[in-house]
Each structure stands twice: as C-alpha cells, then as structure tokens.
Amino acid sequence: KSLMEYWLFKSEPSTWSWEDQVKKGKEGEGWDGVRNYQANNNMKKMKVGDLGFFYHSVKEKQIVGIVRVIGEHRPDPTDKKGIFGMVVIEAVKEVNKYVNLSDIKSNENLSELALIKQARLSVVPVSKAHWQEICLMAETENKF
C-alpha cells in the first residue's frame, strides 16, 4: 500500500465554499471544473484516503478546512470535451485557526510549498513536512 499523500484544493468561496463542502457530508462532492493539465494530473495521482487542505482563494486567501479523497479520478461531467477529470472529496473538519497566505509566505519552513511556487494552480501537492507544519499553524492535531 502506498503512503498517504497530501494536497491543497483551492476554491473561490463565492463558487464553492467550505460551508458548501461541509453540507455535502459523507457523500462528498466531485471536484469538477478544473481545466488545467497540471492540476488535473495532480488529481490523477490521488488515492482514496489522501488528505487535503481546503483553501479559500480570491479575497480570503486562507486554509479553512481539511478534506479527504473518497473517490479517485474519473471523468468530469462538466467537461463536454472529455479531456479533464475530477476526484470526489469529503469535508473532514474545519481547522481550529485559519492559516492565511501571508503567514504561509512568511514561514521559512514553507518556502518550497507549491501553493507559493505554483500560485496559479488550483490543485497542488503538499509534502508531509509541509502538511505537519501547516497543521501546527492551524492549531489542528494531525490525526484524521
């Protein structure tokens, strides 16, 4: 069995918010609408059980929750060309303290984080060390 991987999912709260995700419960929600090849390739690597940070983009720019992958890569029904896919994620818990982008950028332990390095991508990998560091910043125990 491969080790768990960690990810970060960016969403515009006006389009799909943490509250929307939480309302879906155990059924989860397909992470559709991704139209970037690299973000799509990142989703292709995801396995059921992988964890991710849920990040509100645009004005907020902060990590607000933790999600789990419950469905692996499959066709995205919103992509009429059939090029891009999606995974299914469920909300696990809200973080105890929101972690904003400025705090992430000012933490030297996170200088290599893909969120900073590949700022345009909506789905990015997070290393285990970065995951643990952000959990500390979020005052959220890394047990899910």
Where in this protein do the model-derived segments appear?
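Short beta-strand-centered aromatic/proline hotspots
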Residues: 62-72
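Compositionally biased, charged N-terminal/linker segments
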Residues: 2-46, 141-144
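Loop/turn positions that initiate beta-strands
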Residues: 49-50
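Short, conserved beta-strand edge motifs with alternating hydrophobic and charged residues
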Residues: 8-10, 54-55, 66
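Short acidic/glycine-rich loop or secondary-structure boundary segments that cap or lie
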Residues: 17-19, 61-63, 77
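Short, charged beta-turn/beta-strand-edge "cap" motif at the junction between a beta-strand
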Residues: 55-61
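Short acidic (Asp/Glu) patches
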Residues: 33-38, 71-78, 107-109
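Contiguous surface segments at macromolecular interaction interfaces
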Residues: 3-16, 76-144
